[in-house]
């Protein structure tokens, strides 16, 4: 799943920039004395400022008045965030949570935890290491695909945003130059990819530039006003926006890359090991150390490998494990010739899974979803699939990578669809957004371990749905389970144990049927995004543990549909809180 794309939002988490002084005064003036009333008012004020200072986020949620604005990516915004988080913590510590309703005690706990975690993250200079191939200043244009661009005014608003992006590109250059001076850089390998992405965009003719193409509906309007606006857009892209991108690319190639680090792990920057230990805790919502996570990954690899070998015996393969993997990677029967065929297969699988959903759930979201292709501008650099949740009347979308279909095996289609669409992220995140009597900060942010743990858990639900209806599809599911187990090993290996990129790639090649291109893109993702890949398997194992615990406790009274509805009814929560809620469920349902 792609994290901007997820969209800065899925909104697994969001970063906000606040004009805090005004907020403080407003809150002091409005805040009642009683803790319950004060907390309720604080939630409202908090959300108002989240929206006010995050115009892109506001637009995606359908709030009016923000469609021509963007947030700054400057260092000063980073410090505003820090000041606001300190203030939120200060306000919450003056409220007695025991005086709140049971629901608000949970809201209080989650809001405090989120801000404490965000504040701790600011003890590390993450703003110097934002550059990565998965998204950033180089693909701001992608936002247009999530906006309503129908009228001339819609396009005029979008143009105002595009004009602001030029300053953000310049800010990126300044921030990365400062990071270079202080020894905080992304690895050479990652930044080369970013420079390639920028050069790919700036080398296009204006008519083929993704920014210009985002205004394509203006041409069809065929009015003088539309023609004038389109001419202004063209002039700005050619005279200001692309030159700012070219300047950034030149800086990256001539100054940044030659002087950035060769090491790929976070341990290669000052205080990098402590930084990674924090990331491991925050992404998994546990106190597991990198060493403990590494060992857990090795155990899971051994367990899953045994299941994979059982499938190989079932198909009566007469070679060894490695030769079977080579067979899956290279035999034409496992691949479509065109992207159109691949997309049609994903859509057919989604419809098939939809029919099975009532066997596992009682509650369903109102929001629909679709299956569409990842834009070709970013497809070569990104992973196999990702999901973007519904926004402002727009459906949720499962994005499938159609680039080089000869590297996208058919046996991945079932497992990817259950993870990204239903019963995975679309089902989960749409239900979260539709929760009633839950504050907005819980509807549109969350904890990666639960979100991605549910996605991986959903892959196993495909077994009971019968969608792995031949051994190769089952091997595909096991490959994806193995993939997440290997993540525990390679992520900790690269960022904490000085593993090389080749070490990580080879572990994948030896144990999964994923293709070379997929593996390389995945490993590069882990290099650019330390710690995030740990969340999937840790979350999945906890959900499975809690399901088994509930089933054992309730015996014949256990109902899988009720259990699933229950654990999704709180939105995205830390794993320890999830366990508390399951324990309460067991007590309430024990006769």
Predicted segments, located by residue:
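N-terminal maturation segment of proteins
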Residues: 3-5, 9-591
């Amino acid at each position: 799943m792609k994290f901007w794309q997820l969209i800065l939002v899925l909104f697994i988490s969001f970063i906000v920039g606040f004009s805090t002084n005004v907020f403080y005064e407003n809150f002091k003036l409005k805040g009642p004395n009683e803790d319950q009333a004060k907390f309720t008012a604080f939630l409202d004020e908090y959300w108002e400022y989240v929206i006010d200072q995050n115009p892109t986020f506001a637009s995606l949620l359908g709030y009016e008045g923000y469609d021509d604005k963007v947030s700054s990516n400057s260092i000063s915004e980073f410090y505003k965030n820090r000041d606001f988080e300190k203030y939120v913590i200060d306000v919450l510590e003056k409220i007695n949570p025991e005086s709140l309703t049971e629901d608000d005690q949970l809201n209080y706990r989650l809001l405090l935890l989120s801000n404490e975690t965000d504040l701790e993250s600011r003890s590390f200079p993450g703003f110097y290491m934002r550059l990565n191939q998965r998204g950033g200043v180089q693909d701001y244009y992608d936002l247009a695909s999530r906006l309503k661009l129908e009228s001339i005014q819609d396009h005029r608003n979008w143009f105002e945003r595009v004009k602001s992006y030029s300053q953000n590109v310049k800010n990126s250059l300044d921030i990365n130059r400062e990071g270079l001076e202080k020894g905080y850089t992304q690895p050479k390998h990652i930044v080369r990819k970013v420079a390639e992405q920028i050069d790919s965009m700036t080398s296009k003719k204006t008519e083929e530039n993704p920014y210009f193409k985002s205004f394509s509906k203006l041409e069809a309007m065929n009015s003088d006003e539309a023609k004038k606006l389109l001419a202004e857009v063209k002039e700005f892209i050619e005279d200001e926006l692309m030159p700012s991108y070219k300047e950034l690319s030149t800086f990256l190639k001539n100054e940044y890359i030659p002087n950035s680090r060769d090491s790929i792990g976070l341990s290669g920057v000052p205080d990098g090991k402590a930084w990674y230990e924090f990331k491991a805790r925050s992404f998994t919502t546990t106190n597991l150390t990198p060493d403990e996570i590494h060992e857990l990954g090795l155990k899971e690899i051994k367990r899953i490998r045994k299941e994979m070998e059982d499938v190989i015996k079932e198909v009566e393969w007469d070679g060894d494990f490695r030769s079977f993997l080579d067979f899956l990677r290279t035999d034409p029967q496992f691949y479509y010739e065109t992207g159109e065929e691949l997309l049609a297969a994903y859509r057919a699988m989604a419809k098939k899974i939809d029919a099975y959903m009532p066997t596992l759930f009682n509650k369903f979201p109102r929001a629909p979803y679709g299956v569409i292709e990842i834009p070709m501008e970013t497809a070569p650099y990104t992973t196999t699939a990702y999901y973007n949740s519904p926004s402002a009347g727009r459906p949720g979308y499962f994005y499938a990578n159609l680039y080089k279909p000869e590297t996208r095996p058919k046996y991945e289609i079932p497992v990817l669809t259950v993870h990204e669409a239903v019963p995975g992220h679309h089902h989960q995140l749409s239900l979260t957004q539709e929760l009633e009597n839950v504050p907005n900060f819980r509807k549109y942010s969350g904890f990666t371990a639960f979100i991605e743990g549910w996605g991986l858990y959903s892959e196993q639900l495909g077994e009971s749905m019968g969608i792995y209806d031949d051994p190769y599809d089952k091997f595909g599911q096991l490959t994806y389970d193995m993939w997440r187990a290997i993540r525990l090993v390679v992520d900790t290996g690269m960022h904490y144990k000085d593993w090389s990129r080749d070490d990580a790639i080879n572990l994948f090649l030896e144990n999964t049927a994923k293709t070379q291109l997929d593996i390389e893109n995945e490993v590069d993702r882990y290099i650019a995004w330390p710690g995030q890949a740990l969340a999937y398997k840790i979350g999945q194992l906890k959900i499975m543990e809690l399901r088994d615990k509930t089933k054992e406790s309730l015996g014949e009274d256990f109902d899988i549909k009720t259990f699933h509805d229950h654990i999704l009814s709180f939105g995205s929560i830390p794993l320890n809180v999830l366990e508390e809620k399951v324990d309460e469920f067991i007590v309430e349902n024990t006769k």
